[in-house]
Design a protein with these regions (language model features):
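Short, intrinsically disordered C-terminal tails of secreted or membrane-associated proteins
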Residues: 297-300
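Catalytic center-proximal scaffold of phosphoryl-transfer enzymes
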Residues: 1-277, 281
Length: 301
């Protein structure tokens, strides 16, 4: 499963749009909070098992499941360090990390399955060597003075600030198994693009409209979007799906029995979906004064 979140404006305030998606299902919802409070309130990801692909947000790491980190994020950070912080002048470890990740991806794609243990060990050794080179060039800053000194104005309290390179290297070392999960576990992708794509259309909508004026409007929009995105993944005709809602014969998604999709802490299943979805779409059309297309005009679309 893939999970991600992005900021949106609802009722003039910052909210967070959360998504949980698979190859065949999409679920989106907005909440004022970004982390675990939103997961609990929305019923999102609380019981997820298997592998969860995400971008490394701390709240995701607290979930009791196997984790895989998005390497597109890592590559972007490594490119920045290589090009903007003059790392290429001194050592070149960041560029070599990028090349090693891409090489691993190519080998996994060519094999169509996790790599043999000997190749995994080779990549592990290369990764360890690059981490050591990077850490030699970007050592962690150590606290100077004592807490008593800080109270007297000497030194600073709390964790010492680190460079972007040092922070990235620490994360890549601490979560190295999650970085290389795509190489060791069957079917785990290299990136979290599936979740980011699920959020993209809603960001475009926000650029056009500016924000959602009410929480109810946001809930309505994301419910409809969840249904249509799911049916699109399952190769259904979306116009037929909408017609089926109004005809009270809703075309049902094919749900994976291992996955529960929840909305407002209520299970979104085959029993509750038709009426819930129909009422939601009707309210959306009424509130936005959308005029139905005459049947004679259907052929034009």
């Amino acid at each position: 499963m893939h999970a991600d979140e992005t900021g949106i404006r609802v009722e003039g305030k910052l909210h967070w749009l959360h998504c949980a998606v698979t190859d065949t299902l999409s679920w989106l919802a907005a909440h004022p909070k970004r982390g675990s409070q939103a997961f609990e309130a929305l019923g999102l990801l609380q019981g997820v098992k298997g592998v969860l692909v995400h971008d490394g947000l701390v709240s995701y790491k607290a979930l009791d499941c196997t984790h895989s980190l998005c390497n597109a994020h890592h590559i972007r950070e490594l490119v920045y360090i290589h090009e903007q912080e003059n790392e290429k002048i001194w050592d070149g470890w960041a560029q070599e990390m990028i090349e090693l990740l891409v090489q691993g991806l190519k080998e996994v794609d060519a094999a169509g399955k996790p790599l043999p243990l000997d190749r995994q060990a080779w990549f592990e050794a290369q990764w360890s060597a690059l981490l050591e080179r990077g850490e030699d060039s970007n050592p962690q800053n150590q606290r100077t003075g004592t807490s008593q000194d800080a109270g007297m104005g000497i030194g600073k309290r709390g964790r010492p600030s680190q460079s972007k390179a040092a922070n990235l290297l620490r994360r890549l070392r601490e979560h190295r198994q999650d970085v290389w999960r795509f190489m060791t576990d069957e079917g785990v992708p290299f990136t979290n693009n599936l979740a980011e794509q699920a959020l993209r259309m809603s960001k475009v909508k926000q650029k056009i409209s500016g924000c959602f004026r009410t929480a109810h409007g946001a809930h309505t929009f994301f419910t409809i979007r969840s249904y249509l995105a799911t049916m699109n993944k399952q190769k259904a005709n979306l116009f037929d799906c909408l017609l089926s809602v109004f005809n009270r014969q809703t075309i049902q998604p094919c749900f994976n029995p291992r996955l529960s999709i929840r909305t407002s802490s209520k299970l979104w299943d085959a029993d509750t979906l038709p009426k819930f979805l129909m009422d939601t779409i009707r309210n959306f059309l009424c509130n936005h004064r959308v005029t139905a297309i005459p049947r004679s005009e259907h052929a034009r679309f």
